[in-house]
């Protein structure tokens, strides 16, 4: 009876207070239950894969971002090459345009030259023509003047004797001319 | 005679078995104050656990988090989520406060439920979760009060006190009373829950040392986690409430 109660007492024995120390009573300090609880906690904690999910989500996000980045870079590259192409085309167009303008200019200048030359010719011709006309007029005037003078001279100093002499001289001259022509 | 001593022994044994220490403290004398040494010791351990694990977790940060870093980032995300839901858009500066509250209370509670504190024997009292002591929870609750007053005053200046007569001036006494009931309810809820959890476990262990306390201990883990969450959520809610604009 005493043994039983003693064991019972020692079972619930609380080490008396007083100083720091370690309580070695396994039942009072409860490590068995604690380890079971800890084990259950870890077991069920492992079952819940919040952390794995999170990691997976982060990985997916990173992968998606990488893909998006790759796509964006590709698009950028494409856009750049297109820009380059368009730039060269623009350059070509500009060069072409310049040469076209140059050609146009040249042809315009040439045609203007031709027109100018023609005008020059016209001018020269007109001048010559005018000159010719002026000369003719002068000639005509001089001729008329001479004729008038001759007529005056003839009218003033022509008498019968002279008249006759002249006629005979002329007849003689015509006669010689006729002889010569014959 | 023999029988008498035997029966006395038996009674003493029975008394010892059901003798659960409550209100026994390991007093330290610091500058005229009596402080509860066991609470300080366990608080230091909790602080060391938090600081140490956080330091280890962030020592070598990776782009793709693994192990400890992943876990701590998850915890941080959780805390940010709680603060954001309760405080609103301007939750950023309050994440450290809410996070400190939540982590300290959570690790304290769980340390009480998981660590074999009783292996270490003190001259007086026994080691338990720091939140098992009313002083810790009152300190935390008062910090929360200070925090929400600070939040309201910095956000709105003296206009903050306008909320006391907010729906009608008749409610002024109740609104003032609220400032006292908030820390009171916060501290008592946490203290009561944790103390009750631990007491139930201790009593059960002293009655049936094996297997039977395990469900209660698991329940204790659950409730202590919930209590930490409740405390953090309420602190964030009070801060958010004092910062929100009145319409």
Curated annotation (Swiss-Prot), chain B:
Identification of the protein by name: ATP synthase subunit a, chloroplastic
Its job: Key component of the proton channel; it plays a direct role in the translocation of protons across the membrane.
Matching InterPro entries: ATP_syn_F0_a_bact/chloroplast, ATP_synth_F0_asu, ATP_synth_F0_asu_AS, F0_ATP_A_sf
SUPFAM superfamilies: F1F0 ATP synthase subunit A
GO molecular function terms noted in the UniProt entry: proton-transporting ATP synthase activity, rotational mechanism
Quaternary structure and partners: F-type ATPases have 2 components, CF(1) - the catalytic core - and CF(0) - the membrane proton channel. CF(1) has five subunits: alpha(3), beta(3), gamma(1), delta(1), epsilon(1). CF(0) has four main subunits: a, b, b' and c.
Assigned protein family: Belongs to the ATPase A chain family.
Any single Pfam family the record assigns to this protein: ATP-synt_A
Major localisation: plastid
UniProt cross-references to Gene3D superfamilies, sorted A to Z: ATP synthase, F0 complex, subunit A (1.20.120.220)
Localization terms from the record: Plastid, Chloroplast thylakoid membrane
One GO CC annotation: chloroplast thylakoid membrane
Its membrane topology: Multi-pass membrane protein
Keywords for the protein's UniProt record, in alphabetical order: ATP synthesis, CF(0), Chloroplast, Hydrogen ion transport, Ion transport, Membrane, Plastid, Thylakoid, Transmembrane, Transmembrane helix, Transport
Gene name linked to the record: atpI
Record HAMAP family: ATP_synth_a_bact
Spans traversing the lipid bilayer: 38-58, 95-115, 134-154, 199-219, 220-240
